[in-house]
UniProtKB/Swiss-Prot annotation:
The keyword Oxidoreductase applies. One of its GO terms (molecular function) is NADP binding. Its EC number is 1.2.1.41. Catalyzes the NADPH-dependent reduction of L-glutamate 5-phosphate into L-glutamate 5-semialdehyde and phosphate. The product spontaneously undergoes cyclization to form 1-pyrroline-5-carboxylate. It comes from the Bacteria. Its main location: cytoplasm. Pathway: Amino-acid biosynthesis; L-proline biosynthesis; L-glutamate 5-semialdehyde from L-glutamate: step 2/2. It is found in: Cytoplasm. GO terms for cellular component: cytoplasm. GO terms for biological process: L-proline biosynthetic process. The keyword Nucleotide-binding does not apply. This is Gamma-glutamyl phosphate reductase. It catalyses: L-glutamate 5-semialdehyde + phosphate + NADP(+) = L-glutamyl 5-phosphate + NADPH + H(+).
Length: 418
């Protein structure tokens, strides 16, 4: 598209962000309810546009996994609308004043939650992200610029049409939600230079996309390169729990970034646990295993693990296994290979579990639970807009509050500084 100008769009989004910030909770919820209804009412049109993306994807030779993420069905449309209505039910964080304290001179000092401003989302496939990201940004009082992958352009524009119809009906600036219609790579390059108008970039997709955005942006970026999630089976583990959690965390959805990629097993219980794990992983999904020299004998057809295997995010029915001689060795391995996403310990020993929580600083640390719970909705945040594995400005799954920041508010009665 030769007439598209990203700088102009970003400027309009910046102006619209001031409108978004002033909407009250009732106004935002009314918008979101009507958006959910509009998406349902236009499901046939959205699915028709989605079919164009599917056909083009097949012609381009997209993988079946990518096509699965791209496809929209009647159920998918209903799920999208339900996700928006769940956002309606969330508490609006904007305008809350807390941490109010009285200073010796009589002034009261507090902090108020405010929107970030303009958020740019860069993502691949998954047209539902268009609707859910827009809804989260509206609810948190932000404007958003959405740049989906070229493989979903027809679907994204159809969803954007529903969003803009509702915004116009409510007499709200439609540039609160901007969907970039240009699929060229050069637009991403230009988008990442708009530091005067865009406040935050959130990339969602493969490691290559996220690294490209992080390395080329003049705007702060929420980073989450990959999910190398570890499961540590302690010598005081309940082995039945351990097997169930391993199978769930690895095989339920291996393409998810919260799936297990490495399991560490304490040597004291390895002879008991590994045969159970081998059978369970094979029965569940014929999981391919990369095993250390001390565990390879328990897994028929396993390959000998290398350091590269312990760094790998397989995103498939594949896992690395290592026997460790001590609790501290497990901690050391995790800290060496972590991606700061999610780590899990299975142990009935409270003191060891607490030590694990203290010594592992990934964004989510769990005790006796599946890594599959490392998800905004499962953690009680509602829909998540992304995951951060860098400690600034958010850490872990990001919900509504992560799309806001704080400003100081001061209440006085004529005080002056002496």
């Amino acid at each position: 598209m030769t007439d598209f100008n990203i700088a102009t769009m970003a400027q309009k989004a910046k102006q619209a962000s001031r409108v978004a910030a002033q909407l009250n909770s009732s106004e935002k919820n009314a918008l979101l309810n009507d958006i959910a209804t509009a998406i349902e009412n236009n499901s046939d049109a959205i699915i028709q546009e989605n079919s164009k993306d599917i056909a083009a994807g097949r012609e381009k030779g997209l993988s079946q996994a990518m096509l699965d993420r791209l496809v929209l069905t009647d159920k998918g449309i209903k799920d999208m609308s339900s996700a928006i209505r769940e956002i309606v039910a969330l508490t609006d964080p904007v305008g809350d004043v807390d941490k109010l304290s009285l200073r010796p001179n009589g002034i009261q000092v507090g902090k108020m939650r405010i929107p970030l401003g303009v958020i740019a989302m860069i993502y691949e496939a998954r047209p539902n992200v268009t609707a859910e990201a827009a809804a989260l940004c509206i609810k948190s009082g932000n404007a958003v610029i959405l740049r989906g992958g070229s493989e979903a352009i027809h679907s994204n524009l159809a969803i954007a049409h529903c969003l803009h119809q509702v915004l116009t009906t409510h007499n709200v600036d439609e540039h609160i939600v901007c969907v970039i219609p240009d699929t060229s790579r050069s637009v991403i390059e230009q988008l990442l230079q708009q530091s005067d108008t865009i406040d935050l970039v959130i990339p969602r997709g493969g490691e290559g996309l996220i690294r490209y955005v992080s390395e080329n942006s003049r705007i702060p970026v929420i980073q989450h390169y990959k999910g190398v999630c570890h499961l540590y089976i302690d010598k005081y583990a309940d082995l039945d729990k351990a097997v169930n959690i391993l199978v769930n965390g690895k095989t339920q959805k291996p393409s998810a970034c919260n799936a297990f990629e490495t399991v560490l097993v304490h040597s004291d219980i390895s002879a008991k646990f590994l045969p159970l794990a081998a059978k369970a992983l094979n029965d569940a999904a014929q999981v391919k295993v990369h095993a250390c020299k001390n565990s390879i004998g328990f897994f028929p057809n396993a390959e000998l693990a290398t350091n590269e295997d312990y760094q790998a995010e397989y995103l498939a029915q594949e896992i690395a296994v290592k026997v460790v001689s001590s609790f501290d060795t497990a901690i050391g391995h995790i800290n060496e290979f972590t991606s700061d996403h999610t780590e899990v310990i299975i142990s009935q020993d409270i003191s060891r579990s607490q030590k694990f929580i203290r010594q592992i600083n990934s964004s989510v640390v769990m005790v006796n639970a599946s890594s599959r719970f490392s998800d905004g909705n499962q953690l009680g945040l509602g829909s998540e807009i992304g995951i951060s594995t860098s400690k600034l400005h958010a850490y872990g799954p990001m919900g509504l509050e992560a799309l806001t920041t704080e400003k100081f508010v001061v209440f006085g009665d004529g005080q002056i500084r002496q």
